[in-house]
């Protein structure tokens, strides 16, 4: 026999939780819209500067630069972009699984790894990788500043310049749409010419003052833009994942309330029937 009082308390508790998840869903929806607006405003710049760099390199294929040179791989650096807050479904764990797979592959080839961790979830998850971690940052917020983000990344770039790290990747969640976001790994260094540049082979450029100076001025902007774009995409993925998770929690709580209400009504009806039976039996005994 179900205890009516306990069922009523459970329904009240679930309704309180439902009101909290409802508020969080609305907040996440607002933040998701803002993050998508930020993503849409930064994406054209990243695409343009990537295209420009690609054009320049394709036209100067023999140009030598440390960031273009392929090395024998002894150590790979990963810039890991996660969230600061939870309640985002499997967003972070899927990303970490992908990175662990890459790290294990490198270990099999006797290749070391170094990590720059962005977001408290990555810092917490990889806390036992002390020897691999070279820098961390958390609390970047929903509208991060590139000046703050680039500081930990510069430590990894210095290790690349010192030949300690031979290749750098950034791993984050790629935002596709509100319901879809996938772990994505982009190569930061060394820079490679994309095959799409083949259509620019007949273009000729005049450089002022010269190609080398122009390339040196564009290069840091390209790296900053790549990192910032990856982080903004991860933020959009986070807000979308949280909104979907809260909506799912709302739907589940609604179904649970309906089930408990049905059990409550049946238990109440059973109690009423029992009480009526006892009253009738008692009245029969009187007569």
From Swiss-Prot:
Which cellular compartments is it found in?
A: Cell membrane
The UniProt entry lists membrane topology as: Peripheral membrane protein
The main place the protein resides is membrane
Q: Pfam families this protein is in?
A: ATP-synt (PF00231)
**Protein family per UniProt:** Belongs to the ATPase gamma chain family.
InterPro entries reported in the protein's UniProt record: ATP_synth_F1_ATPase_gsu, ATP_synth_F1_gsu
Top-level taxon: Bacteria
Supply one GO BP term: proton motive force-driven plasma membrane ATP synthesis
The protein's matches in PANTHER family, at most eight in alphabetical order, are given as: ATP SYNTHASE GAMMA CHAIN, ATP SYNTHASE SUBUNIT GAMMA, MITOCHONDRIAL
Job of this protein = Produces ATP from ADP in the presence of a proton gradient across the membrane. The gamma chain is believed to be important in regulating ATPase activity and the flow of protons through the CF(0) complex.
Assembly mode: F-type ATPases have 2 components, CF(1) - the catalytic core - and CF(0) - the membrane proton channel. CF(1) has five subunits: alpha(3), beta(3), gamma(1), delta(1), epsilon(1). CF(0) has three main subunits: a, b and c.
Gene Ontology terms: cellular component: plasma membrane; proton-transporting ATP synthase complex
Give UniProt keywords alphabetically: ATP synthesis, Cell membrane, CF(1), Hydrogen ion transport, Ion transport, Membrane, Transport
What name does UniProt use for this protein?
ATP synthase gamma chain
Q: Name one GO molecular function term.
A: ATP binding
Show the Gene3D superfamilies listed in the entry. 3.40.1380.10, ATP synthase, gamma subunit, helix hairpin domain
């Amino acid at each position: 026999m179900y205890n009516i009082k306990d069922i009523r308390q459970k329904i009240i508790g679930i309704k309180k939780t439902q009101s909290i998840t409802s508020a969080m869903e609305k907040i996440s929806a607002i933040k998701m819209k803002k993050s998508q607006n930020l993503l849409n405003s930064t994406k054209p710049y990243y695409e343009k500067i990537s295209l420009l760099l690609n054009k320049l390199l394709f036209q100067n294929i023999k140009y030598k630069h440390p960031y273009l040179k392929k090395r024998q791989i002894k150590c790979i650096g990963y810039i890991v972009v996660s969230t600061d807050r939870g309640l985002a479904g499997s967003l972070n764990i899927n990303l970490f699984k992908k990175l662990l797979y890459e790290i294990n592959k490198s270990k099999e080839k006797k290749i070391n790894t170094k990590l720059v961790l962005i977001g408290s979830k990555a810092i917490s998850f990889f806390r036992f990788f002390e020897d691999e971690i070279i820098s961390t940052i958390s609390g970047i917020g929903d509208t991060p500043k590139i000046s703050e983000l680039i500081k930990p990344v510069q430590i990894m770039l210095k290790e690349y310049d010192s030949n300690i790290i031979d290749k750098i990747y950034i791993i984050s969640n790629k935002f596709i749409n509100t319901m879809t976001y996938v772990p994505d790994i982009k190569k930061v260094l060394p820079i490679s010419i994309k095959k799409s540049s083949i259509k620019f082979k007949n273009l000729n450029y005049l450089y002022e003052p010269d190609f080398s100076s122009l390339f040196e001025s564009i290069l840091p902007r390209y790296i900053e833009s790549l990192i910032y774009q990856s982080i903004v995409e991860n933020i959009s993925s986070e807000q979308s994942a949280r909104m979907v998770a809260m909506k799912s929690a709302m739907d589940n709580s609604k179904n649970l309330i309906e089930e408990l209400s049905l059990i409550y009504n049946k238990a109440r009806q059973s109690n009423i029937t029992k009480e009526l039976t006892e009253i009738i039996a008692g009245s029969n005994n009187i007569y």
